[in-house]
């Protein structure tokens, strides 16, 4: 918590906007939504304002989050349909949901394959938001990779293709994916990120995938379901 005291709360409306866009695209109106690794719970608050009939459930293992949850429940009209649970989702959860969210989650997990496989049976659909930390520039500089490991706890680094293959290898069928334009539009961009916006725009325009692999600056939003479901 000392390394990331804000828990990236300023990014929550932007991130939820990405989730809502993908759900609207597929005309999905989930009645039960669960977020694994829900952090402060802000994502669920914003999603609850979009899906006004949905029951909302959040799980996280960090005991420091309890005050945020109490604050959010007390100050928000969603308190009658919003619940938080402290502990491991796979140990505590007894429900199946219309939708599970994992927004910046499995890059923090020591064994992402087992974690993802164990989650398969708990929902019909899944939305993932995945940071794409791995690029030619980040490998050459090295510091960006060490920073996200030290400051926000990323244990695994992905390109677009590695992220999608990780999901496929864990039993998921990819229904849709898209870049989020994170380095060009997210609220918490650093000065260095803003300075890189011009070269990134140029390379993205020439060839999006190649530009991302070279200069980074992107995250991925993915809609998936269990294979064979």
Residue ranges of predicted features:
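Active-site loop signature of alpha/beta-hydrolase-fold enzymes
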Residues: 64, 92, 108, 133-136
